[in-house]
Swiss-Prot record:
Entry-annotated residues carrying N6-acetyllysine: 30, 52, 245
GO molecular function, one term: structural constituent of ribosome
Residue numbers of Phosphotyrosine PTMs: 252
Subcellular location: Cytoplasm; Nucleus; Nucleus, Nucleolus
Biological source species: Felis catus (Cat)
Residue location of crosslink Glycyl lysine isopeptide (Lys-Gly) (interchain with G-Cter in SUMO2): 30, 245
Domain of life of the source: Eukaryota
Lineage summary: Eukaryota, Metazoa, Chordata, Craniata, Vertebrata
Protein name per the record: Small ribosomal subunit protein eS1
Gene expressing this chain: RPS3A
């Protein structure tokens, strides 16, 4: 019995305090080329050790970034989720993974004396991504209206919801993911819905409030490189060491931004 006790004691005394951060590396996170600001931030990962490879620990990480940080503008109530799909050198290349409205924006729109209309739809893009889009809109007073409330009849609500679903389906079905994200950035879909429903009942605050990624096609590096504005170099890069190629393309960031 005593033997075991002393053995345990010895083990406790020997333990050295190792700073866990000494085993970790910082990686840069890069957003796709559709956004103005490509450098989102940094992320930590434990260095490659034995069978545990660092890049595997990074793949699948989701970063939630405000649109204001991606586009350098003031409107900050849209949040985009970006997922790491590939690691090249010290860069994590991300792809669109979803969109959301901030809680405070959502709560500020919901008020009394108006009807809230919500719709959702599952659509597949032309390049095989299955998205679920949620839309929200609110009725508003007509210009000459005196009555305090502006409630839509159930029939009108159903018509508006049908229109919402039609427009969302149409806008996504005919485009690939890149185009869809380009539409989500200024939320042109919401504006289209607002215009289309004007004849049924005047709406305001119409937004695609959320986009979920349900299914993705098989991962292709070439497609991801195209998203990151390096489509031309990706063909050549496959033969040589990819790390150096990407580093170079990365050094040329300002001109890339101007073209966007």
């Amino acid at each position: 019995k005593n033997k075991r006790l002393t053995k345990g004691g010895k083990k406790g005394a020997k333990k050295k305090v190792v700073d866990p951060f000494s085993k970790k590396d910082w990686y840069d996170v890069k957003a796709p080329a559709m956004f103005n600001i490509r450098n989102i931030g940094k992320t930590l990962v434990t260095r490659t050790q034995g069978t545990k490879i660092a890049s595997d620990g990074l793949k699948g990480r989701v970063f939630e970034v405000s649109l204001a940080d991606l586009q350098n503008d003031e409107v900050a109530f849209r949040k985009f989720k970006l997922i790491t799909e590939d690691v090249q050198g010290k860069n994590c290349l991300t792809n669109f993974h979803g969109m959301d409205l901030t809680r405070d924006k959502m709560c500020s729109m919901v008020k009394k004396w108006q009807t809230m209309i919500e719709a959702h739809v599952d659509v597949k893009t032309t390049d095989g991504y299955l998205l679920r889009l949620f839309c929200v809109g609110f009725t508003k007073k007509r210009n000459n209206q005196i009555r305090k409330t502006s409630y839509a009849q159930h029939q009108q609500v159903r018509q508006i919801r049908k229109k919402m679903m039609e427009i969302m389906t149409r806008e996504v079905q005919t485009n690939d993911l890149k185009e869809v994200v380009n539409k989500l950035i200024p939320d042109s879909i919401g504006k289209d819905i607002e215009k289309a429903c004007q004849s049924i009942y005047p709406l305001h605050d119409v937004f695609v409030r959320k986009v979920k990624m349900l299914k993705k096609p098989k991962f292709e590096l070439g497609k991801l490189m195209e998203l990151h504005g390096e489509g031309s170099s990706s063909g050549k890069a496959t033969g040589d060491e990819t790390g150096a190629k990407v580093e170079r393309a990365d050094g040329y960031e300002p001109p890339v931004q101007e073209s966007v």
